[in-house]
Amino acid sequence: MDASRCGDPIRVLLVEDHSGFRLVLRALLEADERLIVVGDVGSADEACAHPMLEHVDVALVDVGLPGTSGIEATKRLRELNPDLRVLIMSGSGFDRASDEALSAGADQYLEKGALHHDLIEAIVQAGERGRTTSAR
């Protein structure tokens, strides 16, 4: 079921330490009516403490966060919200970190240079899978 058809946009939390890139991502995602960005933060600690975390469908997390890595953030976020879908982003392509991210509970590993359509579709698909799983 398409979330936009039932009137409930997929709620996204952006976790990216580069504020300029975070603003661009937010604008890109908010341009799609199927998505709503409920927050954007620059660290794993901010993400884990976000007041809307229990209502987030998908977290889009940078692998290279300062302090706590995106991989460790994935583990913590999934512990705090087991229904959360986590998509890890990296600017360095697919490497050992992709395996680590998936092992940590990430649903998908994406390159930051991915076409915006591919990024949005990955978020929508992850959000819809999460809603299907949590409804059971």
Which functions belong to the PLM regions below?
Residues 16:
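Conserved acidic carboxylate
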Residues 63-64:
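The short loop immediately C-terminal to the conserved phospho-acceptor aspartate in CheY-like receiver
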Residues 43, 69-72:
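Acidic catalytic/metal-coordinating carboxylates
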Residues 72, 93-110, 114, 121:
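Alpha4 helix (beta4-alpha4-beta5 surface) of REC/receiver domains from two-component response regulators
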Residues 96, 114-127, 131, 135:
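C-terminal output helix
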